[in-house]
Amino acid sequence: IMYEKNYGRVVFTSSVSGILGSFGQANYGAAKMGMVGLMNNLSREGASHNIHTNCLSPGAATRMTASVPGSSIDVDNPDEGNHPGLVSPAILYLASEDAPNGRIIQAAGGRFASDAVYSNAGVDLGSDATEEDFLGRVDDVLDLSEAELKTQFWK
């Protein structure tokens, strides 16, 4: 239907647990980071049809966050800074006509930020590279001081 109408907005729910990691939440984090991969692919596939696909990475008092060991969250009476409604401005924007394409927005407690994948220029060791070659340049491979936003592989 979106292809036929040449318009659409898709918003997936990711999580800080997937993007940054969270102790004891490997399975959940892996699934939520998978949403970012799905978004990256669909944002490319739908772009020519004005279909924008994005991710929201929310933080709020929910039944799931209340179930984390040591949590003192009361989902029936969340404190003002943890209320789920505080992510609403971001979701409304991502579902709007003005929505970007292929972006991740964090929303928690009235604070908003953007996450993205950054890469450095890389190191070309040639097709006969050895482990020793790699180890000799590993500092350059790991150096993110001049990293740039990546939207395509090796570009």
Language-model region placement:
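Conserved catalytic-site region of short-chain dehydrogenase/reductase
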Residues: G18-L20, T62
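C-terminal helical subdomain
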Residues: V75-K155
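Active-site helix of classical SDR
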Residues: A31
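Hydrophobic structural elements of the Rossmann-like NAD(P)H-binding subdomain
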Residues: V11, T53-L56, G102, A107
